[in-house]
Amino acid sequence: MWIALLGIPILLAVLTLLLKHINKTYFILSLTKRVRTEDGSPLESKVAIMPGKTRFGNNLDILNFTPASVFNFVRESTAKAKGQNYLWYFLYAPMYNVVRPEEAEEVFQSTKLITKNVVYELIRPFLGDGLLISTDHKWHSRRKALTPAFHFNVLQSFLGIFKEECKKFLNVLEKNLDAELELNQVIPPFTLNNICETALGVKLDDMSEGNEYRKAIHAIEEVLIQRVCNPLMYYNWYFFVYGDYRKHLQNLRIVHDFSSRIIERKRQQFQQKQLGEVDEFGRKQRYAMLDTLLAAEADGQIDHQGICDEVNTFMFEGYDTTSTCLIFTLLMLALHEDVQKKCYEEVENLPEDSDDISMFQFNKLVYLECVIKESLRMFPSVPFIGRQCVEETVVNGMVMPKDTQISIHIYDIMRDPRHFPKPDLFQPDRFLPENTVNRHPFAYVPFSAGQRNCIGQKFAILEMKVLLAAVIRNFKLLPATQLEDLTFENGIVLRTQENIKVKLSKRVK
């Protein structure tokens, strides 16, 4: 009997040693394999490991968070890491958070790390297999097919539409002189109209239809955050029972019906004209995005669902992200009178009649472009992007288990004081050519980087230049909102809880 009793402590000791050994390789309470260094050195020498609120890793750290508290939690985690990249351990998978451009470079440049992470799976019902989410052959073939739709000559053909929409926008501003103008209300219709008429080739005349689309987009984003902040919500069955599933379906139906009507309208126009035509010099004409997709459909390279996915992706990315940047840029111009004055002096050199301003002249607005870039640095429209290890992969000298989630924190990378001294100050001069010479090539990545960078970034910059030049030339911007009054929120794009407001006064010429 006493021999049996003596054996119990020995058995417990053996089990303890066994568990310790297993725990070096596996985070048992998170049911996931641990990250380890390739050379066997301590993991803490390469990455900070964020302690969780419980013994179950970081699984319960963001439970029932709001978009605002998610934003603050990520900023606090970055501050605790003290300039290091850091690890979270969630159920079934670690998450590697990259906040330094040096390590982000390897992720961006990797040919293995092109699969988006699990958060994007929650967006799939909205965007399908569009460029943002698709991978492998589908992504490569679609990217190759769509690249010509953003060629210089195509962008040049959009200039007239941008100018026309700007005139309508200026008329809206004229009606709001000396009043507080809510930028969140007036900017999105402008960018949505531009997307529909340029890239999609359909004029959006029914503004109420556009308003319904924008409201549905915001509702979809709220559901996304609800699911991100509750690990159980990642499971569709749980979301169906306890989440806003039916409301989500209704909003998906609104946005998909909206894009489908646009596609059908364009398909009818497309069938009435001869594609493959040549211009007066005998060169094959280039077409905007939806024309390109319809031509590919006619050649059997893409089906109707594929067109819907790409249109939904580009409408969302092109309208919402550009709106966000324009809103923050106008706010920063209102808050910094000296910067606004320099921009005004630059745009004053443009021809009197906006119809006479060429693409070349817009490209010469160097300081205005610096202002746009600095706004994007401080307030990136997309504050983070995600990747996933589809197999065990070595990243930055660490062995990442299969299914490791990688989050590249664009917001924090572009506020790294080593590359942007006094990062919380608005200083457009950072982007003057002479000040960018020695900067790390991946320190400024508002449009992502590497092979999965944003296909429409030149489109966005031109669109913003045209609008900002027109506004600055005709109106003086005065602040009605202060930065310290804003509560930032993490979503698919960066948002604030409060509407951002400015005041306008007419410039006397």
UniProtKB/Swiss-Prot annotation:
Keywords, comma-separated and alphabetical: Endoplasmic reticulum, Heme, Iron, Membrane, Metal-binding, Microsome, Monooxygenase, Oxidoreductase
UniProt membrane topology term: Peripheral membrane protein
Chief location category: endoplasmic reticulum
> Which E.C. number(s) belong to this protein?
1.14.-.-
Q: Name one Pfam family in it.
A: p450
Q: State whether keyword Transmembrane applies.
A: no
Cofactor(s) for this protein?
A: heme
Q: Which SUPFAM superfamilies match?
A: Cytochrome P450
**In its keyword annotation, does this UniProt entry include Lipid biosynthesis?**
no
Report the GO molecular function annotations.
heme binding; iron ion binding; monooxygenase activity; oxidoreductase activity, acting on paired donors, with incorporation or reduction of molecular oxygen
Which cell locations does it reside in?
Endoplasmic reticulum membrane; Microsome membrane
InterPro entries named among the record's database cross-references: Cyt_P450, Cyt_P450_CS, Cyt_P450_E_grp-I, Cyt_P450_sf, Cytochrome_P450_Monoox
Q: Which Gene Ontology cellular component terms are annotated?
A: endoplasmic reticulum membrane
- The superkingdom of the source organism is Eukaryota
Q: What are the binding positions for heme in this chain?
A: E317, C454
Q: State the function annotated in the UniProt record.
A: May be involved in the metabolism of insect hormones and in the breakdown of synthetic insecticides.
Q: Which family does it belong to?
A: Belongs to the cytochrome P450 family.
- Name this protein carries in UniProt: Probable cytochrome P450 4ac1
